[in-house]
Structure formats: C-alpha cells, structure tokens
C-alpha cells in the first residue's frame, strides 16, 4: 500500500488548496516531532501534516518528502520503497542463473521470465543488451540478433 504525499504552501499569494491553508500556521502540528509547523512548505501524508525533515522512513531514515520518493505505510510504519519491498515484497529466481532475486532489486523481464540485470545478456556471445537491441527468447536463453542463427544451429533447432 502506498500513499500520496502532498506538498502544501502557506504562501498567502497562492490560492488555498483546502481549508488547512486558511488556518494560522501555529495550529498545524507536525506528525513527527509534534511541534508547530511555521514553515512555508510542509507535507501532508497519512492524514497528518509534517515538516519536510520529519517525514522519513522508520527503518533507514531517508527523507520521504523528496520529489520522486514514494511513501509506503503498512502496519503503522512509514517506509521507503526499498524497505517496503525488503519487508513485504516477494523474492523470485533469475531465469538465467537460478539464484535469488530480492524484491527490491532492479530486474529485466521478458514475458514471464525475470533476470538479474547482470544476467540479461546474450547466451552465445555474453554481450549485455542496450536499449533498442533486438533479441530472441529461446526457452530461458536470450540470444542477440547476430547470434540467433548460430545458436539455433548449435542447439539442434535447425
């Protein structure tokens, strides 16, 4: 379960987003430090208001209010994506090396197969693929366009 983080501003020249912006800043209390929020910018998440520095992952402490970050909230814990996946994500197996892929690792997918980034390479020449490279999936083997004919011949497919 992920939650949206809203950025709010107390700039009087801006039109109010909701009724909270019409309240004096001293009435807003931070969900983290429990102090009044007098800052111009603050965050709203989990039905509470936060100083930008107070909204952080309960495990690793990284700031969750930064642009591009996502807040996951489960079992009363505020978590970053990596810690959420580490605790609640499902691990899998790489289709190439049969070793464990942790839920938070970056992977490549082809149809129903999942690969470590370092395992996503041509089975014939071992070249790693770049964006736009063409390849063929043969069973769990990935073969680059240049090696398809040779690979299928060697493996008795022609």
From Swiss-Prot:
Molecular function terms, GO-annotated: DNA-binding transcription factor binding; metal ion binding; transcription coactivator activity
Pfam families: LIM (PF00412)
Predominant place of localization: nucleus
Gene Ontology cellular component annotations, sorted alphabetically: nucleus
Single GO biological process annotation from the record: positive regulation of transcription by RNA polymerase II
Domain LIM zinc-binding residue range list: 30-89, 94-153
Cited InterPro entries: LMO_RBTN_TF, Znf_LIM
Source taxon at top rank: Eukaryota
SUPFAM superfamilies attached to this UniProt entry: Glucocorticoid receptor-like (DNA-binding domain)
PROSITE patterns named among the record's database cross-references: LIM_DOMAIN_1 (PS00478), LIM_DOMAIN_2 (PS50023)
Note on domains (UniProt): The second LIM zinc-binding domain interacts with KDM5A.
PANTHER family documented for this protein: LD11652P, RHOMBOTIN-2
Name of the featured protein: Rhombotin-2
Originating species: Bos taurus (Bovine)
Gene name as annotated: LMO2
């Amino acid at each position: 379960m992920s939650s949206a983080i809203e950025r709010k501003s107390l700039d009087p020249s801006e039109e109010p987003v909701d009724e909270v912006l019409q309240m004096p800043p001293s009435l807003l209390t931070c969900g983290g430090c429990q102090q009044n929020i007098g800052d111009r910018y603050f965050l709203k998440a989990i039905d509470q208001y936060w100083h930008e520095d107070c909204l952080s992952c309960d495990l690793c402490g990284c700031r969750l209010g930064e642009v591009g970050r996502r807040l996951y909230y489960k079992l009363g814990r505020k978590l970053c994506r990596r810690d959420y996946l580490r605790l609640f994500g499902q691990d899998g197996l790489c289709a190439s090396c049969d070793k464990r892929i942790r839920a938070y690792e970056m992977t490549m997918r082809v149809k129903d197969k999942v690969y470590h980034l370092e395992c996503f390479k041509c089975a014939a020449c071992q070249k790693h693929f770049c964006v736009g490279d063409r390849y063929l999936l043969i069973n769990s083997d990935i073969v680059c366009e240049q090696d398809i004919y040779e690979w299928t011949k060697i493996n008795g497919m022609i």
